[in-house]
Amino acid sequence: MASPSPANSPMPPPQAPSPMAPPSQSPAPSPHSPYPHQQPGPLQGPPPPGHPGAYGHPMQHGPPGQGPPGHHMPPHHQGMIFSKGPHMGMQMPPTGPNMSPYQTHGMPPNAPTQPCIVSPGGPPGGPPPPERSSQENLHALQRAIDSMEEKGLQEDPRYSQLLAMRATSKHQHLNGNQVNLLRTQITAYRLLARNKPISMQMQQALQAAQQQPPPGPPIGPPGAPGGPPPGSQHAGQPPVPPQQQQQPPPSAGTPPQCSTPPASNPYGPPVPGQKMQVAPPPPHMQQGQPLPPQPPQVGGPPPIQQQQPPQQQQQQSQPPPPEPHQHQLPNGGKPLSMGPSGGQPLIPSSPMQPQVRGTLPGMPPGSQVPQPGGGPQRQVPPAGMPMPKPNRITTVAKPVGLDPITLLQERENRIAARISLRMQELQRLPATMSEDLRLQAAIELRALRVLNFQRQLRMEFVQCTRRDTTLETALNIKLYKRTKRQGLREARATEKLEKQQKLEAERKRRQKHLEFLAAVLQHGKDLREFHRNNKAQLARMNKAVMNHHANAEREQKKEQERIEKERMRRLMAEDEEGYRKLIDQKKDKRLAFLLSQTDEYISNLTQMVKQHKDDQMKKKEEEGKRLIQFKKELLMSGEYIGIDEGSIVADMRVHVVEQCTGKKLTGDDAPMLKHLHRWLNMHPGWDWIDDEEDSCGSNDDHKPKVEEQPTATEDATDKAQATGNDEDAKDLITKAKVEDDEYRTEEQTYYSIAHTIHEKVVEQASIMVNGTLKEYQIKGLEWLVSLYNNNLNGILADEMGLGKTIQTISLVTYLMDRKKVMGPYLIIVPLSTLPNWVLEFEKWAPAVGVVSYKGSPQGRRLLQNQMRATKFNVLLTTYEYVIKDKAVLAKIQWKYMIIDEGHRMKNHHCKLTQVLNTHYIAPYRLLLTGTPLQNKLPELWALLNFLLPSIFKSCSTFEQWFNAPFATTGEKVELNEEETILIIRRLHKVLRPFLLRRLKKEVEHQLPDKVEYIIKCDMSALQRVLYKHMQSKGVLLTDGSEKGKHGKGGAKALMNTIVQLRKLCNHPFMFQHIEEKYCDHTGGHGVVSGPDLYRVSGKFELLDRILPKLKATNHRVLLFCQMTQCMTIIEDYLGWRQFGYLRLDGTTKAEDRGELLRKFNAKGSDVFVFLLSTRAGGLGLNLQTADTVVIFDSDWNPHQDLQAQDRAHRIGQRNEVRVLRLMTVNSVEERILAAARYKLNMDEKVIQAGMFDQKSTGSERQQFLQTILHQDDNEEEEENEVPDDEMINMMIARSEEEIEIFKRMDAERKKEDEEIHPGRERLIDESELPDWLTKDDDEVERFHYQYDEDTILGRGSRQRKEVDYTDSLTEKEWLKAIDDGAEFDEEEEEDDSKRKRRKRKNRKEESDDDSLILKRRRRQNLDKRSKKQMHKIMSAVIKHNQDGRTLSEPFMKLPSRQRLPDYYEIIKRPVDIKKILQRIEDCKYADLNELEKDFMQLCQNAQIYNEEASLIYLDSIALQKVFVGARQRITAAADAAAVAAGDNTGEAHGNGGSDNSDNDDDDGGDDGSDDEEIATTSAAAVKMKLKLNKSLASAPATPTQSSSNVSSGAATTSKKQTRRKRSQKKYTISDDDDDDMD
């Protein structure tokens, strides 16, 4: 097959070899080639005779033209450059007449494709010249490698490629014929396995391989050199080397063997017709001559030798070209690839045909010619290293494999048989077939008949096509070219053209280089753009994925919130069934655990309630049997005649019978046992009878008409049947099922089991007169009666003011009227409410005999005698008398025990509970309380244990149920809102049968509202000075008279700092010597009166502004105070103001208290203020004629204050109630109020996990005390802001008219004050104080240490033992312990840092005092510097308008709390522009940053409260920008002015203007304070330790012992007799303290 001519060939012309690449390489395999790249293993030589080849069949040398067929070249392999003859690195397999060129696979897949280099001087069609031998290629490759090493280019990637080429070009394993044959066999096997036909070319190749004879045995002795047989050399052939000439010829009949040694590289095809022999080693090897280095031989299949193709035989007849220059091999061999006849070079038939491997004629048998284009081979070891011995060729024959030719022939035979069989079938078809089927059969028969003809025609056509398209010039382009002689002119033209070509080539090269650079740059840009687009796309995809997941998560969260809201809705709607379904769907283990726990607890409680009722029933039956037996004994013995009417059986009925007629009287008609004797005398002929069926007397005779409690569903079913409407009936039944008792268990409901006997009560008892009970009170009476009928005890816990007293009286009268239970009833009440109970009984039940058991011991003994002599129904007494006179009162068989203010029983171990449980016997008990849970859960358990000890036995079990439900599961103890509601509902479930609580807002809609305000009061200068030293050092300043230094000042330490601080907050004159020395300073007579009473106290000053306004608008005031000494000072103030008042405290006698209540509640009473102590007057009093409650100082227990508030906010109140709680800013009262709020929050939530199990230790209490004493003042200024007159007027006013009245009164007051005392403040300032009160810290510290000398050394008496105060006491007990047993120890701390920190804090506290001159000076300087700037900034903000609208108008003044109450709930720190302007005037801003902070807070408040799209929201954002811009503009102008002023004044002012001088003042002030700090670093800090007297802790408290005293230090006897009761040291009552007996 001819190759294309250079003119029309798409291949570029051959180029010279490059030094950077091997001189000659085979073309690389195309990546699109259908044939996989095979890397043959190393060759070890041909197998012995008869041994099968490497591919399963014996190696044979068949006739020419029967070699393996070539493979068709893929159409896209057009970039290959072919040489004119066979290349040294190419292996040309023999090709048949119809074989296409074959692409060799000698190079590795990653080898670059380079054109094959053609020898420039070789003749056309001749063999490659020796100059281009492989050895020269290796030398050129080595030179390129050495050149790169000299230039230091070892890191260049081409260097490693050259090394790989050098390593791989030294040995080849398989030649092209072997590879082709191997691939042909593999392809044939694959086609046979897939049952596919094999092409004709493949069949010819396989047949040629099969017909090759196996190589014969070697000729000659072992080791003798072999050569070709005689006559094989033709004329013109170069002479054979001597080694080959000396070889004897082979014997006849034995074919010569292939001369190719193992791993030899063929450089020419073998001679046709000559058998190839295995050449023995040459003589120089036998003589020990050194061999050239060879690669190590690895075992592998021997090469398959193929005969010369017929194309080469045809080319041998051509005339020989001139003989080229011979290349001498290293062993002195002859030129390569000489033909067998006359030395003519062999011409390959196709440029793609690979050569057969062979050895060079002169090379030793073991040497291998390097292959430049070979594949990856093993590297040649360096010279001098010993070569491994090649493996011996084994003589064992390999097993003969399957012959694909035989298989192919069998397949062809089968196909031919099938075709003939099919043709016979088609010829024998019946004539009855349809026309279309017969037509199809005829078509198929003709197609099968013409098959062989088609095959022959196709073969002839293909052969003719190949013969016609094959040209003689295909093999040799210059075959018919006429040579032309070269002349001088042509040479010059040639030179000129050559020069032009060079220039053009250089221009093209540069152009190509530029294009290459441009392409590289463009590729770089494209690459960057590609990656940028990829990143952008990836970012978009990531964003889309994130959005998808965010949306999915949002939807999931919305769904979860919806489900949670639905669960909460059903939970709050008591839909137990629906809630459990949602819990099952959510599969929340915690909620399911709570529900299962609740069911378990309710089940246990149900069993305990059943057991309790059974036990009570058995006791009642046994008691009835015992009474019947006792009555029978009295009748039999006749002792009933003189029976005592107070006997337990005196009221039992006795059945009588008339002897003559047999008539019987039973039931109510029968006489009582106490009247039996008189009745028998009046009715002769009658006699008593013994009736065994007589049960339990009057109790059985008067059984209540009761019925079993029907469920709500049964009632609804009855109503539905009565209505007759199906839809209404369904709705009614469904609603009833939801409203039915949610505590349903398997058998019966928990509540219905507890209240099995249900008695309907529709009206009050007939003996209850002078009023009618409200509907909810009737329901409460019905519940109380149900408790009685079911032998249960309970708690009536209605909110304060709903009439628990009236409901109790109605229960007593109902039992007396309907049940005939005449008593006696024991009602235990506080002493302060005892007169109120007596009044209520006199009003509502005058027919009931009531005994008020109180008074002195002599009076109580008279009452005891009276009780024995006369009948009574109710005994009213107090807690103390129940304990004191238990020997007398416990003997009475009480029917019912009722305890008012039942939260007094909150301590299970208190003396009252123990006495009532051990000494008093009452089958029924009832507690009345408005606050069943005050502090912690065990208090509630104590109440339930007192009522039902058989049900609520263990406190720990009760606490575990409701305190830490998850403590046993190992999960976190904290509860979320839903779990908390479940726990609360669990508590309500447990308490529902035993506790009834209604709120005012639920039952009394007409009751007016109650609004509470906290009014903050400022301190006077006297209060600030005393409070500062008491807080920091625990000392009270004196004038020094106790040390004989009158007027020079002094200090003394006082116990119980917290109480002293509270006293200073109320009034400084609660310390008597302060009042006396102040009188000496002002010229008084020991007692201060007049305006100075309110000017020295912030709270009194506030009262002086409030009380006249309330009196002018006809409001009446209840003023509650904790300390009776403060009440005395308030009395002096009220007397000076001439306000009518009444006073009730712990010292008020019981008989006087009722009179005080009547006087205040009387119509037309002129009493304006009722002055009460919180403990004495805060319980059980009806003072609804007052509508204003002033809490002068808060109690530690918030429920005490709530009780006090409800004295006015109760049934009967017609006006809105205002509660004003006074609190001094920056004082201990803030912490007290915070603790009260904490307790109220606890009471509202009823229970929180882990909240009630904390037991305070001594260290915790110490830390709490230190926190109160040394509180930091870093709170917001808004929280410490004192309200002005306008705000106070809004708090106390009930209408707009009152606000106008209050404004007018404020103006009149200010005018009057200005006229009387012009320029004087309402609170005294520091300038009005004595000199001994204005001492600095150094002097006070010195006074303190002088006072400490006596304290530290002592007076010689024994030291009080220190008690570890770590038990669990309430705040009341703790404060009482501080009052009675605490003392101070001063110790010096060693840490200077702590001392400095404390001094720094003290200095900060001093900075808040207006009395400091330095602070005033700074504020004055501050006014001059920045007040003008602040006004300018605020003016710019106020005047800013947009679209003709002033933006600041809505922000000027906030709406009132009445108009917008929710605003003040959402916004914690309300601010408006008017307030900011007022603060600028008051110099409360130190710099512009504070002003900006407040203004930004104003804008943030507007943005928090309003929606984003609202106009106010947008205006607030705009005002923020206006403020920032105005500040920058004004401050820049001020700085420029300051710089100009500095330039004008020169160097006299230092570095700047007024700002720097102000800074100098500030620095000087700071330096002075630092000096003060340094001077006082040796001062000792006071550290307080709590100590409790052991005798106080162990001895039981009595009313006199439990009274708290005001500790005033070493109090001296007053020299002058004052009208105040200074000897009275009580500030709380003793008889009403709820902790005196705990």
Swiss-Prot record:
One of its GO terms (molecular function) is DNA binding. Signal peptide: none annotated. The keyword Transcription regulation applies. Its main location: nucleus. It catalyses: ATP + H2O = ADP + phosphate + H(+). It is found in: Nucleus. This is ATP-dependent helicase brm. Residues 1425-1530 form the Bromo domain. Keywords: Activator, ATP-binding, Bromodomain, Chromatin regulator, Developmental protein, Helicase, Hydrolase, Nucleotide-binding, Nucleus, Phosphoprotein, Transcription, Transcription regulation. Residues 699-708 have a biased composition (Basic and acidic residues). It comes from Drosophila melanogaster. GO terms for biological process: axonogenesis; cell dedifferentiation; chromatin remodeling; dendrite guidance; dendrite morphogenesis; hemocyte proliferation; imaginal disc-derived wing margin morphogenesis; imaginal disc-derived wing vein morphogenesis.
